[in-house]
Design a protein with these regions (language model features):
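Short loop/turn segments immediately following the C-termini of beta-strands
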Residues: 14-15, 69-70, 123-124, 177
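Gly/Pro-rich loop segments of beta-rich domains
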Residues: 25-54, 82-108, 136-162, 190-196
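Short intrinsically disordered, low-complexity coil segments enriched in acidic
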Residues: 1-7, 11, 17
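Residues marking helix boundaries in flexible regions
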Residues: 12, 57-59, 67, 87, ...
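A short loop-to-beta-strand structural motif that recurs across blades of beta-propeller domains
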Residues: 17-21, 27, 72-76, 82, ...
Length: 196
């Protein structure tokens, strides 16, 4: 759930494959997605299709960033409701660009920093991924092994990372479902346990 500069609240609805928005006056709309279609398509309104949009983030320009989980994609929705694709990969694990990118099942957390970089909790791969505005995907931290080891980059381990937040200095905070911890990742990829 995110709030924009006008006080509107948006959520991703994975069961209906839509994005919902509620105004400060409690008017609820569905600005993108089609509850009758589970699929993949860019566009506006119900011409845009999602397959289990799982989490949502917002930038300072009120653009929404969406994990389109079953499409292994990161999508962007403008304030006017136009949906575009930043990266569309497939199942597995691979960094890179375009269709070469792979995400694990149930990628579940997303956050965006002030430079427009997206951070994804790749839950199935126990990694935190970074997606640049140009769509280049790299692994910020984690090596795929489930654990709670602090370290740098691939020297760190996560156990089912779920939700993310980014502070003004570019540090990423990660919640772990199974260990019930909050981890901190610096922009250089140094992982520490923030809340044990």
């Amino acid at each position: 759930m995110v709030a924009d500069s006008q006080g509107n609240v948006s959520i991703a609805d994975p069961s209906l494959n839509i994005i919902r928005k509620m105004t400060p006056g409690a008017v609820v709309t569905s600005p993108a997605g089609n509850c009758l279609i589970s699929g993949f398509a860019d566009g506006s309104g119900n011409n845009a299709h999602f397959d289990a949009p799982r989490d949502i983030a917002i930038d300072t320009s009120d653009n929404l960033y969406i994990i389109d989980s079953n499409n292994y994609a990161m999508r962007k929705m403008s304030p006017l409701g136009v949906v575009s694709t930043i990266v569309h990969g497939s199942y597995g694990f691979a960094d890179g660009t375009g269709s070469a990118v792979k995400f694990g099942g149930n990628a579940s957390g997303i956050a965006v920093d002030s430079a427009g970089n997206i951070y994804v909790a790749d839950t199935g791969n126990n990694r935190i991924r970074k997606v640049t505005p140009a769509g280049e995907v790299t692994t910020l931290a984690g090596n795929g092994t489930a654990g709670s080891v602090n370290g740098t980059g691939a020297g760190a381990q996560f156990n089912s990372p779920m939700r993310l937040a980014v502070d003004g200095s570019g540090n990423v905070y990660v919640t772990e479902l199974l260990k019930r911890r909050i981890r901190k990742i610096t922009p250089a990829g140094v992982v520490t346990t923030f809340v044990p």
